[in-house]
Amino acid sequence: GGRRIGEFQSVSNKIAEMKMRLEGGRLLLYKAAWLKNSGRSAFMESAMTKVVLSQAFVRNSQDALQIHGTYGYMTESELERDLRDAIAGNFYSGTTEVLTDLVAKLVTP
């Protein structure tokens, strides 16, 4: 037999990058929730979380497709649907550009 897919450095590095993007977004989400639960404004953190996680979902979906090769593009794999959903997620509750502009206005008086 051959090697397991995770034993290839390019694949394992891609998976590590996927994990880092997800965990970074998760920490932002937890901070926004903590601020809100503390009775403080989480307006900027919520916008940042939406942008970071939406972009992570797109990038992670693209990486998953690349890891799976042509199988990832087949509808049976559901990975192609994940990518379509991820791209659409950039438009729900404000586009990435609008939310980024909002954050820019909040951090640059």
Which stretches of residues belong to each language-model region?
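Alpha-helical interface subdomain recognition
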Residues: 1-109
